[in-house]
Amino acid sequence: MHRYRSHTCAALRKTDVGSNVRLSGWVHRVRDHGGILFIDLRDHYGITQIVADPDSPAFKVAETVRGEWVIRVDGEVKARADDAVNTNLPTGEVEIFATEIEVLSPAKELPLPVFGEPDYPEDIRLKYRFLDLRRETLHKNIMSRTKIIAAMRRRMTEIGFNEFSTPILTASSPEGARDFLVPSRIHPGKFYALPQAPQQYKQLLMVAGFDRYFQIAPCFRDEDPRADRLPGEFYQLDLEMSFVTQEEVWETMEPVMRGIFEEFAEGKPVTKVFRRIAYDDAIRTYGSDKPDLRNPIEMQAVTDHFAGSGFKVFANMIANDAKVEVWAIPAKTGGSRAFCDRMNSWAQSEGQPGLGYIFWRKEGDKLEGAGPIAKNIGEERTEAIRKQMGLEDGDACFFVAGLPSKFYKFAGDARTRAGEELNLVDRDRFELAWIIDFPFYEWDEDNKKIDFAHNPFSMPQGGMDALENMDPLEIKAYQYDLVCNGFEIASGSIRNQLPEVMVKAFEKVGLSQQDVEERFGGLYRAFQYGAPPHGGMAAGIDRVIMLLVGAKNLREISLFPMNQQALDLLMGAPSEVSPAQLRDLHVRLAPVQKS
């Protein structure tokens, strides 16, 4: 028999009754029932119940074992009594009557419980992550992560993509987020950077003639902590394709992403055909470029109904600025004053002056609008709004006014808030859609200049003609995001592979041809030697997994994450290094400036 086990702790069934077996694992818990000891033995695969009675030669050792000790058990498989069968366990019809128990490794008193799922301080969980990972839910999440990534690889390979690994040590780029820098010992005073994404390398692969590329790519960004991103590193399904339009990228990747969700959604419905929503429409309809489409609320402009009306707050704004708009946020079943007042109070807590509303109710046989706005704009305008928004008795509508560029995010938050409070959101399905036609440029208010809105390597729609003849803020990009349930889960574009168009695009943000050559020399140089039209995308693996397993945050699907202060409490990183190491790297530390 094998030194440690003949079976795993999930393998034994009723057909094994009478067999002599050997198991090894962790003591999940010990129970004493009338002098007989019951030990739940756990390994990676599952749990098996061990029985040690006082007449067994194993009993003396069984009395000493405690939670999370590692033991080996020899014994005979016996069927449980009918009233003792545990239907929650695959091994629940059998138990092992121990004949020998060997302690392989005792455990100290635990700093956090492994049995059960009690809440525990996060820093303790991260410091003792090796114990935390033994807990059932987290262990299951990590295995789901492994299976999802394997499925991504399988699906990409099946449709003709080749996996290539791109360098981890690369050049620093001033674009985007802050780099993690690595000093060079061989080249004093110079630094490598960890890649924020394999963007330039994957485009170079297309120039090199590798038609379809993908990898499970680690990405590193020295960003301030965010709720939706772990400090330090994250992973993406990165891909690129040659000789494609953006429609072909969508048609290629939609079955892959839908298939991943269907495979791991545990029966929850997944969108069959992904909608394609223009960025401008997403902002105006949902107040977000990553809308949760499970929420049925769709906003509309109702400016005309307030122009010249008796509701002077809005009417005066419209009269004084032609760019002012009024947006309506319909709220089916929200037609009570109590709910409307709660929404108004919430708006004030968000720093807004309030949230105007109308709600409709039956007065005899007549449907009437109620609330201060209805009173001020009159019955005819109130009825026109109701008909436009498709509202009935018991429904409400909220209103925001001003410059859409200033208020759209708040309007989107109000839409989300109303949908959640009224239980309009179906949480048991996955709604995916493409957001397309992103703006190529945006106005940087802080620096009073035009800047790239998203990926500077995207091809502008209209190419050189658009760059030379259009208002930069009107130019759209061949850029697209894939969104799911209110999260951006992938982003991509058709790339700008023409050197002269690339230079012109960067000129608009104040960078010269020399700047482009210095900052993106490898890519710019490659484009001089025959670059195919190409495009691709990258899907955020961590976020996809979080959605599929229903985790509340990214730490629940990551093996050894840092905390929100970017500290690795398990390994003690970041840490000081020795003076000798610094000398080797030609690095001298300056005194820390106190803020």
From Swiss-Prot:
Residues 199-202 are annotated as: Aspartate. The record marks 33 as: Important for tRNA non-discrimination. GO terms for biological process: aspartyl-tRNA aminoacylation. The keyword Protein biosynthesis applies. One of its GO terms (cellular component) is cytoplasm. Its EC number is 6.1.1.23. ATP binds at residues 221-223, 488, 540-543. Keywords: Aminoacyl-tRNA synthetase, ATP-binding, Cytoplasm, Ligase, Nucleotide-binding, Protein biosynthesis. It is found in: Cytoplasm. The keyword Ligase applies. It catalyses: tRNA(Asx) + L-aspartate + ATP = L-aspartyl-tRNA(Asx) + AMP + diphosphate. GO terms for molecular function: aspartate-tRNA ligase activity; aspartate-tRNA(Asn) ligase activity; ATP binding; nucleic acid binding. InterPro entries: Aa-tRNA-synt_II, aa-tRNA-synth_II, aa-tRNA-synth_II/BPL/LPL, Asp-tRNA-ligase_1, Asp-tRNA-ligase_1_N, Asp/Asn-tRNA-synth_IIb, AspRS_core, GAD-like_sf. L-aspartate binds at residues 175, 221, 454, 495. Belongs to the class-II aminoacyl-tRNA synthetase family. Type 1 subfamily. Homodimer. Aspartyl-tRNA synthetase with relaxed tRNA specificity since it is able to aspartylate not only its cognate tRNA(Asp) but also tRNA(Asn). Reaction proceeds in two steps: L-aspartate is first activated by ATP to form Asp-AMP and then transferred to the acceptor end of tRNA(Asp/Asn). This is Aspartate--tRNA(Asp/Asn) ligase. The gene is aspS.
